[in-house]
């Protein structure tokens, strides 16, 4: 009988840890940090300005008061076309859940330059298409602040969707604690 009780106890503990790990995985998919796939509070490791403060544009911070932000800066070139198509599909799917800015880099919209300056993941020469997600998450001290992730690559729908789903999850979890 004693062996049976120990076996049940051990099995219960194992089940608890498996369930706890599963619940933990349901939260944010990407951590806050400085790595290539992280949400960033400062310029990431691969940037020439690594660790430097980000000058968040006021129009992004204003939009962030109500929901996560997707910014897409591009030209009407062949290289940008696949990302533009992916962004358009995803933006309609997430309509109402995010604030979406599609900004031409070929016009006179000052927001294009502001976004490129603020959110270029590599520093140096800025390229398009630039895809940026901005949300809210706790920094290393636990204070909720704007975090971002961006790329100048053509990523496709899955990559964009994964980051937007995570942005929404982070936002829902942390927006009430943001002292804007």
Predicted regions and their residues:
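N-terminal targeting signals for export/organelle localization
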Residues: 1-50, 166, 170-180
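A short beta-strand-turn-helix
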Residues: 46-69
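Thiol-based oxidoreductase modules, predominantly thioredoxin-like and allied folds used
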Residues: 51-53, 72-73, 95-113
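Typically the conserved alpha-helix immediately C-terminal to a functionally engaged Cys/Sec
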Residues: 58-60, 81-94
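Non-catalytic, surface beta->alpha helical segment in thiol-disulfide oxidoreductase systems
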Residues: 126-180
